[in-house]
Amino acid sequence: MGDPGLAKLQFAPFNSALDVGFWHELTQKKLNEYRLDEAPKDIKGYYYNGDSAGLPTRLTLEFSAFDMSASTPAHCCPAMGTLHNTNTLEAFKTADKKLLLEQSANEIWEAIKSGAALENPMLLNKFLLLTFADLKKYHFYYWFCCPALCLPESIPLIRGPVSLDQRLSPKQIQALEHAYDDLCRAEGVTALPYFLFKYDDDTVLVSLLKHYSDFFQGQRTKITVGVYDPCNLAQYPGWPLRNFLVLAAHRWSGSFQSVEVLCFRDRTMQGARDVTHSIIFEVKLPEMAFSPDCPKAVGWEKNQKGGMGPRMVNLSGCMDPKRLAESSVDLNLKLMCWRLVPTLDLDKVVSVKCLLLGAGTLGCNVARTLMGWGVRHVTFVDNAKISYSNPVRQPLYEFEDCLGGGKPKALAAAERLQKIFPGVNARGFNMSIPMPGHPVNFSDVTMEQARRDVEQLEQLIDNHDVIFLLMDTRESRWLPTVIAASKRKLVINAALGFDTFVVMRHGLKKPKQQGAGDLCPSHLVAPADLGSSLFANIPGYKLGCYFCNDVVAPGDSTRDRTLDQQCTVSRPGLAVIAGALAVELMVSVLQHPEGGYAIASSSDDRMNEPPTSLGLVPHQIRGFLSRFDNVLPVSLAFDKCTACSPKVLDQYEREGFTFLAKVFNSSHSFLEDLTGLTLLHQETQAAEIWDMSDEETV
């Protein structure tokens, strides 16, 4: 037992100081790296001995706590810790805190017994952090622990704490500052957690703990040690001294009767360095033999109410609402990667730039689904205004948008996306797309406007990765199909009937530098390996576009049509289905290692191993709502296609707007003559005549 006549030494415990940046980094680590992994993780904090009077003894964790190689702030001491992050609140509550404390305390005890703590004194200052992060509400539950080994008896004070300037002269204090700074520089650090210290009237010397035998050679009664002390109380040392005294008692109690302790505190006020508020006192080392078993340990932090329990921090109210929305948008997506689709590459989806040509029923639904996938860059193109019939079918508009003649759809859609999620980069362009069979040569003004529209569309397609064709008419899809094919852009097309729809990806032409005989990666697969269908194993560069099945050129489809024929009349749920499938098709293509060149999946592949983590990558999805059925046909590119055939692309790339103007101002026969469709019609008619002649002969 300690001497009953002597006062007992008491310590100021650490207070955890977890920065908002730490919780943000934990959120990112949980979503992107840890996921369901509850294994302990190494983290790092620090404490400081220069705080102003009145501040608690703090151990700080910042955003850099997860980077073990990150530098510690200047003049701060690092503290190594272990993070135990649970997946559920129940697991957090039922975690065996006693076992966690015992495990950490045993590590400290082993470092003391082996002498490793003399070589690396940071091993004496370890901490635990038990956490649960509710990433939906941004509530973070945590319980902090800084394990301290307990001596079998309390530590008696031989001489009570006094300030350093009461024990040392100004000359000695200045010599101490210089000696400490020199030792730090020699070790390549700005702070040392513990050091040896001896002084007389003329000199002050300091050294590392591992040199204690040589440093205190010849001393038999008392030694002096320095402790980097984060506490600023005049009568009490900080928590780091506790484990050091256990080390001293274990290693030196047989050699020395007492230890003089300098709690080194070093702060700068108004540009002047001051260590005089450091305290120095003398304690009696317990004379006892330690058993090999780890001593009892304490260290769990009390909560705000002063009881033994965890703490909770609610960051939902203080975080930037835009950042909060951005993190929440990504939450469900990143949860997919935890267990369901670990190989999902979300960066490919989030970073893709999408151009939506058409901001009507399909455009609105496609945009909402793109946002659900976390796509941050969406651009609308449309020339229509919002009418009173639109808001019930087009979810980006409301009644007020129809007033005063209606807002431009493209601009209103972009504005609404930013209101839904401020993190999206949404733009709208109120412009027309010139079309075959719709003349633009009425005047120089209309001709010049068409030229500007074409240039604008070319620039938009050039600046985006995926082009969605979501317009009302067939001919309005022709120009973007030609431009996108020439620029080798992925095109996703969606079109509606009354109770049918088609969603397809256009074939992606080979890069221009490749010759006709060059092989894309998909072509290296042997046809017999993936099925027996006639259209099995068609690589992406051989797939057809929206116009490849046509044997006539596109023209003015609205001329001489009644109202029900001019408007898109379809079952209300059809656009939602087709819009969602269009986006899902894009995502599946992006997840395929060959992207737009991926071999097309067909209905025959439904029972085969899917080529991506998300499943099949079809060429087309044709749906029949009356039968609640979908089929996945595949079609080859047509060498006489009026949009993507080599003849059309060559003419466009050589002549540019001159060629396009001919298409706009001419009848459909111009494209048919160019591509060879006219000759095909003539040959077909001739064959029919010969067939009739043969029948008459018979």
Curated annotation (Swiss-Prot):
Keyword check for Cytoplasm: yes
Catalytic center residues: C567 (glycyl thioester intermediate)
Localization: Cytoplasm; Preautophagosomal structure
GO cellular component labels: axoneme; cytoplasm; cytosol; dopaminergic synapse; membrane; perinuclear region of cytoplasm; phagophore assembly site; presynapse
Post-translational modification: Acetylated by EP300.
Crosslinked positions (Glycyl lysine isopeptide (Lys-Gly) (interchain with G-Cter in ubiquitin)): K41
Residues making up the signal peptide according to the UniProt record: none
UniProt GO MF annotations: Atg12 activating enzyme activity; Atg8 activating enzyme activity
Tissue-level expression: Widely expressed, especially in kidney, liver, lymph nodes and bone marrow.
Result of knocking out the encoding gene: Leads to hepatomegaly in liver and accumulation of abnormal organelles in hepatic cells. Liver-specific knockout leads to loss of autophagy, increased accumulation of CRY1, decreased blood glucose levels due to impaired gluconeogenesis and the disruption of the circadian clock in the liver.
FAP motif, short sequence motif: residues: 11-13
Keyword set includes DNA-binding: no
Any one GO biological process: negative regulation of cardiac muscle cell apoptotic process
Highest taxon listed in the record's lineage: Eukaryota
Pfam families, alphabetized: ATG7_N, ThiF
Post-translational modification Phosphoserine, affected residues: S693
Stated family: Belongs to the ATG7 family.
Domain comment, as recorded: The C-terminal part of the protein is essential for the dimerization and interaction with ATG3 and ATG12.
Biological function: E1-like activating enzyme involved in the 2 ubiquitin-like systems required for cytoplasm to vacuole transport (Cvt) and autophagy. Activates ATG12 for its conjugation with ATG5 as well as the ATG8 family proteins for their conjugation with phosphatidylethanolamine. Both systems are needed for the ATG8 association to Cvt vesicles and autophagosomes membranes. Facilitates LC3-I lipidation with phosphatidylethanolamine to form LC3-II which is found on autophagosomal membranes. Required for autophagic death induced by caspase-8 inhibition.
Subunit-structure text: Homodimer. Interacts with ATG3; this interaction is essential for the transfer of ATG8-like proteins's thioester from ATG7 to ATG3 and plays a role in the conjugation of ATG12 to ATG5. Interacts with ATG12. Interacts with ATG10. Forms intermediate conjugates with GABARAPL1. Forms intermediate conjugates with ATG8-like proteins such as GABARAP, GABARAPL2 or MAP1LC3A. Interacts with EP300 acetyltransferase. Interacts with FOXO1.
Protein name: Ubiquitin-like modifier-activating enzyme ATG7
Origin organism lineage: Eukaryota, Metazoa, Chordata, Craniata, Vertebrata
